[in-house]
Design a protein with these regions (language model features):
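Residue-level preference for the first positions of well-ordered beta-strands
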Residues: 127-131, 158, 189, 221
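Walker B catalytic acidic pair
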Residues: 194-195
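Active-site donor-binding loop signature of nucleotide-sugar glycosyltransferases
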Residues: 61, 105, 163, 257-259
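Pre-Walker A (pre-P-loop) alpha-helix and adjacent loop at the N terminus of AAA/AAA+ ATPase modules
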Residues: 91, 96-130
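Short glycine-rich substrate-engagement loop in P-loop NTPases that contacts/grips substrate
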Residues: 108-117, 148-189, 199-206
Length: 280
């Protein structure tokens, strides 16, 4: 049977010398490119244990190459993680483009969205959400999408959906209503887009309340976008709507989105381009 130190000796790889490498005055092998050692001496006690006086060491070149490889691998893992979060978190691929980088700089509430992302840990700890309200086309969904994309880039899981999709998912779910709603509530941030546009049936309102109430009890933040005014939210038409609206206004800080109708403006731009093409 071989002594233990012989087995250890076999486990230490030999240093591969390149043509430009050289032996320094200290007897160690040096890299011919960066002029730093590719070997290091063992302490005396370790030399006896391993049966040799030196072991491989990273020269500056090798260290830089290793760090570059590790950084590239970390970037790859990050990209894969973000891609998975966006695949699971968005119900519409177009939402991927709703980012701060793509913003035209004309929405005055964009700073409010940035503030939310920059202070996410405080928002999460305080269970603070936004109620982005205003007329059609004022960029509410885009603002919410900017928040979602920015947090996903930080590898924070976000779900952005709407109640039309939620109700369809509930109807088609094989796992049961409770489990589906529990999954929604596990997301650190839930964004419900176009709130108030869902079907006003008794069943639909009941499911809307179940989702909102479950999120409320989970003590996790919620962001809601809606075309409803604060007056409509504060003066619901009936009890079924009141208990829903009360939960939302308790959980979410109102942020008024007003100004230019970006959808109408974009439609006008397309019309002008079409006219130009037809006249050319």
């Amino acid at each position: 049977m071989k002594p233990a130190f012989e087995d250890m000796n076999l486990q230490i790889p030999a240093v591969t010398a390149e043509p430009e490498d050289y032996t320094g005055e200290d007897g160690l092998l040096y890299c011919g490119k960066c002029r730093t050692p590719k070997e290091a001496y063992f302490p005396a006690d370790k030399a006896t244990l391993f049966g040799r006086d030196r072991h491989p060491a990273e020269c500056d070149c090798q260290r830089a190459q290793r760090m570059e490889r590790e950084a590239a691998e970390q970037q790859r893992k990050h990209r894969d993680k973000v891609e998975e979060l966006k695949r699971r978190g968005f119900t519409d691929p177009a939402m991927r483009e709703w980012t701060f980088a793509n913003d035209n700089g004309r929405n005055p509430q964009m700073k409010t969205a940035r503030f939310y992302v920059e202070h996410w840990e405080d928002m999460k700890a305080g269970n603070i959400g936004y109620l982005l309200w205003g007329s059609v086309g004022t960029g509410k969904s885009y603002l919410a999408g900017c928040i979602a994309n920015a947090l996903m880039e930080q590898e924070i899981s976000v779900k952005m959906t709407n109640f039309a999709a939620v109700l369809n998912d509930l109807a088609a779910s094989f796992e049961g209503r409770n489990e589906y709603i529990s999954k929604l509530c596990r997301y650190p941030l839930l964004i419900l887009d176009d709130f108030g546009m869902e079907r006003g049936t008794e069943y639909g309102l009941e499911q809307v309340y179940n989702v909102i109430d479950s999120r409320y009890r989970s003590e996790k933040p919620l962001i809601v976008t809606t075309n409803l005014s604060l007056d409509e939210l504060n003066n619901p038409p009936d009890t079924a709507h009141k208990r829903i609206y009360d939960r939302v206004t308790e959980m979410c800080t109102p942020v008024c989105c007003s100004g230019v109708n970006f959808r109408r403006e974009k439609a006008q731009e397309k019309m002008e381009r079409l006219k130009k093409l037809m006249n050319d």
